[in-house]
Amino acid sequence: MQVPLCYFDDDPANSRNAAKTCGGAMYDIGCSCVTAGRWFFEATPQRVIGMIDLDPAFQTARLASALLDFGAGRQLALTVSTQAVRYQRVQLVGTLGRIEIETPFNPADGAATRYLIQSAGSTELRVVMLPGANQYALQCDAFAHAVRGKTPTAASLDDAAINLRVIEAVFASAKSGRVETL
């Protein structure tokens, strides 16, 4: 599984560039990549190795790459950046085929998301379009329903804590230069 997720923002007034509020690429958008891997593999990484480039002025991760090992041959390679051209993908490659999701995390308002599906042994790509939606309005609605007890939340605080442990392991690996075990 490969997940690049990048955007450009070098505004010192933006909280995503503030070290004191856990800004930077890993905290801001790396969590989306980690979540994608955990949901797809239905597991938590066992080991991680990471490389991080800090912005000299902000002291936040402006570029981070990590390899997350979920065991049993399941790996997620992610690259996130807050100072690169806007780009995002999720690519899943396996023995039976592959799936590529264009703009999986935040497509432009109302824009459809395209899925490309290829079966093993075929060069043909099947295209599936997911209709556009206002994802932020949907998130607010889902939150309101959860607060009112109408529906469960999509993720728990325990789930968020697991993601944070994975992200902190990426930082520890980048600092130590070694694989970190979770």
Describe the residue ranges of each PLM region.
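C-terminal helix-rich "cap/oligomerization" subdomain common to oxidoreductases
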Residues: G71, V128, H145-L182
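Short acidic, glycine-rich loop/turn motifs
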Residues: L68-A72, L116-T123
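Short polybasic amphipathic segments
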Residues: V90, A108-G121
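A non-catalytic, amphipathic alpha-helix used as a structural packing/dimerization or gating element
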Residues: S32, L138, D159-I162
